[in-house]
């Protein structure tokens, strides 16, 4: 089965930072969906895509702005269900004859509560069933709908959004002012479940199906060509490598680049596992002197990422020539990598940081990219890894960034700081495993801070580095909360690091959520 054989849901992106979460909620329901920016969706695109239903995302724009993001008018004439979210609701009302007003004292940002009207709606099955007869939602809007379009009725209200939930049940158009995709709308998943049920989706998107489709796509793209795979030992690149090897066998050669930025003993573990257990063709390229030399004296995080991305390509091109010339470069790029790096014209999703798999790559490349995981979220990659037979202990490893410890070492990178960081990180992860917490945490690591602090050890004065412990819980990496360690755990861990790691005399714990922070420090 190819992706064209699935029921297809189109998400038209108007620039929301959380559009990918809409896709994630739909994937959890085994629905195949794609996200496309509004400015690339026209009548010809709609004809070719063949959507069974459409969702309008939120976005930062106002329908009053010059050149405001809008869908093609014909989308409302195709006889398919449409769900508008936040700005998507305002667009729907604006296009269909309703009215939107600027937010003067009616803006809502954050938690709000929606109460039902007397009318019943299939779309709200499972909502408003508690004793309080209201639902917590997450609002983020300035403008608001002041008059609904002809054919629509009101099914839910909030203090500052009298048309919080509206629907035209004849045409199966639904519109909500809040964001059901975020975790701050606890019952939001039920709305998506109801929407795809009413639209008649079969729910046939699974990782078993994706595996077969991806293998077919890889074979079609690569043909008889050779592929060189960037193997880091992380879950993403490892699943990509095993998937590609299953598709094309020894046309694949993996290159493990030791850039001097890996965790303690990681290089030996990765090389041993893939050579001995998976029997993958693997080149171990120790290029640590090259990378650390180019990074010497560099403090800016974006510059670090771009240097690392550029050097990766140089190294891969060099080893591709040594193995007889590879036509393709494989990477474990994921959906969140792309959404945090791409800003499309006219629907300004703000670029947060470049990723070494995406924005850090130079324009000049002598190989085509193979990115079989580009459409997947992290938990889908893990499910795919299970389908491919990778060990559960390996699939459950925490994410590790391509630039490695470079972005956990704010400021200038030195070999001394990297050695200290490796030891501190090893102690921290050992503590987490010892307390049985590893699988409860999405990602945990140590960052070594670019400051030295005064301390006292025994009768002597110390002047050593401070470090920050980081641990977060998340579903997909798009949003995250800090993990609530006990004070006893933090005290025990800090004591171990200070006693066992020369060069550290102060330990802090980072309790910043995402947003406003990012998971990594750089």
From Swiss-Prot:
* Protein's pathway: Purine metabolism; GMP biosynthesis; GMP from XMP (L-Gln route): step 1/1
Record Pfam families: GATase, GMP_synt_C, tRNA_Me_trans
Q: Where is the active site?
A: 86, 179, 181
Reactions this protein catalyses: XMP + L-glutamine + ATP + H2O = GMP + L-glutamate + AMP + diphosphate + 2 H(+)
What HAMAP family does the database record attribute to this sequence? GMP_synthase (MF_00344)
Q: How does it assemble?
A: Homodimer.
**Protein name per the record:** GMP synthase [glutamine-hydrolyzing]
Taxonomic source organism: Roseobacter denitrificans (strain ATCC 33942 / OCh 114) (Erythrobacter sp. (strain OCh 114))
Q: What is the lineage of its organism?
A: Bacteria, Pseudomonadati, Pseudomonadota, Alphaproteobacteria, Rhodobacterales
